[in-house]
From Swiss-Prot:
Gene designation: OSK1
Protein species of origin: Oryza sativa subsp. japonica
Record-given protein name: Serine/threonine protein kinase OSK1
EC number: 2.7.11.1
Binding-site positions, ATP: L20, G21, I22, G23, S24, F25, G26, K27, V28, K43
Record lineage: Eukaryota, Viridiplantae, Streptophyta, Embryophyta, Tracheophyta
Induction of its expression: By glucose starvation (at protein level).
Length: 505
């Protein structure tokens, strides 16, 4: 990846400062971007630690997704620098700490202040859902505050490297914010999980306490699964209406992001720039800021190369400088993607021909974005977008799993159960038949039908992937296959063969 300084030092473009924190994969340090003088936070992800936790491929994938996000209330990722030992993730620096500490210090907030935070959170969550990314670990500790007390959702995507079905084993945080379907290991599509967590956060903002809290974990789980909590009498009628609609145990009956946006409590004093979702990234990059362009050109970069790099979303010294300068200008002048910016964006996008939009979407998918239709649906909310990843079926979950296991057997795929409806698999065209290893009833038993081979048997001709079954809002079930490692083309061959074997999808 581009990003190394001119002296060969991977971080030569930055002056490294003190350590801000230490996480599971490594440290986070403050740094100064030398060309612009702006501060950034550099997350140092240790490759050895990531590999030992089998997270390497997922971390890379989620970073690619996060690099495309451009939203005022999501921490911006400016640059990713790869070295043999570490991955350096250069991100927006915010200095006012976590929303968690803010709540602890101030206690319950007045409705106006709580609503302002909540509007920003929902806007950021909605943006990610529209781009087919779910956080699954939203909590005040992951919500940072900048110098103007604006919310920044942190680790969006990076926190989502946890395997489905492994939430309690892999999450180092508290399950207080987790939805019932998550801690129960039930099927879930994703967006509803974040709505529940946002409901817990809203409760904490308005009440200064958590709705579900107990030192005894089994008791805590019982409260969450039963939706057992109390609403304080000081809450306004509209707040008392919204919170219970978010904390509905059945995810299919839970309020949606769009319905939250339309709720009377939410719409009070809603800023103009949050009144509609921001443009998709593919459209945002078409609008370039002339003043910022000139600033970067004055640093010695070629204008044509800079514009081309920005349109193609390339990462290099010039584009990193551009976005650092642009973000700082928006913060200090018109605010976070303020109304003026939106109006100029709208007028610019109105001139974009329909033929341009699909190409832009395609370009972004090639740069690591999750493939999804509807990139150009500017005015559609998250609830209008259909989550159509994977294969859909109305068959019973057990029937689907039975057919999946039959298909895996026919293809000589080894598998191991890691969740109720989640398994990790390994396939190599050269493997001999493993039919004798499969369960005759084709269902999840106490043991898994995976052959544990030693390292000598692993080769570049082996594909590792995961299968997860989800439930969608329209009472369908969705089967998703996700490559973990191995040749991409070999994985596509497997998917094609797998499709021909299935009988219920």
């Amino acid at each position: 990846m581009e990003g190394a300084g001119r002296d060969g030092n991977p971080l030569g473009g930055y002056r490294i400062g003190k350590t801000l924190g230490i996480g599971s994969f490594g440290k986070v340090k403050i740094a100064e971007h030398i060309l612009t003088g702006h501060k950034v936070a550099i997350k140092i992800l240790n490759r050895r630690k990531i590999k030992s936790m089998e997270m390497e491929e997922k971390v890379k994938r989620e970073i690619k997704i996060l690099r495309l996000f451009m939203h005022p209330h999501i921490i911006r990722l400016y640059e990713v620098i790869d070295t043999p030992a570490d991955i350096y993730v250069v991100m927006e620096y915010v200095k006012s700490g976590e929303l968690f500490d803010y709540i602890v210090e101030k206690g319950r907030l007045q409705e106006e202040e709580a609503r302002r935070f909540f509007q920003q959170i929902i806007s950021g969550v909605e943006y990610c859902h529209r781009n087919m990314v779910v956080h699954r670990d939203l909590k005040p500790e992951n919500l940072l505050l900048d110098s103007k007390c604006n919310v920044k959702i942190a680790d969006f995507g990076l926190s989502n490297v946890m395997r489905d079905g492994h939430f309690l084993k892999t999450s180092c945080g508290s399950p207080n914010y987790a939805a019932p379907e998550v801690i129960s290991g039930k099927l879930y599509a994703g967006p509803e999980v974040d709505v529940w967590s946002c409901g817990v956060i809203l409760y904490a903002l308005l009440c200064g306490t958590l709705p579900f809290d107990d030192e005894n974990i089994p008791n805590l789980f019982k409260k969450i699964k039963g939706g057992i909590y109390t609403l304080p009498s000081h809450l306004s009628p509209l707040a008392r209406d919204l919170i219970p609609r978010m904390l509905v145990v059945d995810p299919m009956k839970r309020i949606t992001i769009r319905e939250i946006r339309e709720h009377q409590w939410f719409t009070v004093g809603l800023p103009r720039y949050l009144a509609v979702p921001p443009p998709d990234t593919a459209q945002q990059v078409k609008k370039l800021d002339d003043e910022t362009l000139n600033d970067v050109i004055n640093m010695g970069f070629d204008k044509n190369q800079l514009i081309e790099s920005l349109h193609k979303r390339l990462q290099n010294e010039a584009t990193v400088a551009y976005y650092l300068l642009l973000d700082n200008r928006l913060r200090t002048t018109s605010g976070y993607l303020g109304a003026e910016f939106h109006e100029s964006m709208e007028s610019s996008l109105a001139q974009v021909t329909p033929a341009e939009t699909p190409n832009s979407a395609t370009d972004h998918r090639q740069h690591g974005h999750m493939e999804s239709p509807g990139f150009g649906l500017r005015h559609h909310f998250a609830a209008d977008r259909k989550w159509a990843l994977g294969l859909q079926s109305r068959a019973h979950p057990r029937e689907i799993i039975t057919e999946v296991l039959k298909a895996l057997q026919e293809l000589n795929v080894c598998w191991k159960k890691i969740g109720h409806y989640n398994m990790k698999c390994r396939w190599s065209p050269s493997f001999p038949s493993h039919e004798s290893m499969m369960h005759n009833n084709h269902g999840f038993g106490a043991e898994s039908a995976i052959i544990e081979t030693d390292d000598s048997e692993k080769s570049t001709h082996t594909v590792k992937f995961e299968i997860q079954l989800y439930k969608t809002r329209d009472e369908k079930y969705l089967l998703d296959l996700q490559r973990v490692s191995g040749p991409q083309l070999l994985f596509l061959d497997l998917c094609s063969a797998f499709l021909t074997q299935l009988r219920v999808l």
